Amino acid sequence: MRRLDDRWKVQSECADGTGRRSVYLTFDDGPNPCFTPQILDVLAQNRVPATFFVIGAYAAEHPELIQRMIAEGHEVGNHTMSHPDLSKCGLGEVQREVFEANQAIMLACPQASIRYIRAPYGAWSEEVFTASEIAGLAALHWSIDPRDWSRPGTDAIVDAVLASVRPGAIVLLHDGCPPDESTRSTQASLRNQTVMALSNLIPALDACGYEIRSLPEHH
């Protein structure tokens, strides 16, 4: 199976055609009952939008967080039902992961409009593209990965984004962790660096003349 051989099928930047210095914040692997509310609080305090690529099983466990995301003007995307490496899955399994995640999101919040999918680990394949197209979802990757999941330090996360930012950039951050990793981390400190980094990153991007915006309509 191919992994990003067909890069033209995966959007990793967004040129919105307005000429603005737009940047897009995305969060993977939630919702997490500890850290997602903190991240939503920071976004609300700064009045900026984000897109949350949620794991369907977590959405089913915490529908109130999906509802809060939508109520506060954010977007929810599909990050599969259980976060497998889809490049190792057959088409049937990929379709189940995508469909069940969509279903879980809509059950959690019927007002959600799901436009995008992001493959776990960024592991794209022809099967993922096919399943996404059937589900009416556009494949969305990222252009900046500060590796916040590795807990490199708050300043390191912010500096990594600022060093690579450009108009149309899609920033990858994490508000939770996959099911197979959740038992290996201390919940109390799992994503605290991401929360603190976000509080510093938003004003830093603003100072550099960037505007954090919602993802534009895909074509």
UniProtKB/Swiss-Prot annotation:
GO terms for molecular function: hydrolase activity, acting on carbon-nitrogen (but not peptide) bonds; metal ion binding. It comes from the Bacteria. The keyword Cytoplasm applies. One of its GO terms (biological process) is carbohydrate metabolic process. Pfam families: Polysacc_deac_1 (PF01522). The active site is at residues 28, 174. Residues 21-213 form the NodB homology domain. The record marks 148 as: Raises pKa of active site His. The keyword Heme does not apply. Belongs to the polysaccharide deacetylase family. This is Chitooligosaccharide deacetylase. It comes from Mesorhizobium japonicum (strain LMG 29417 / CECT 9101 / MAFF 303099) (Mesorhizobium loti (strain MAFF 303099)). The lineage of its organism: Bacteria, Pseudomonadati, Pseudomonadota, Alphaproteobacteria, Hyphomicrobiales.
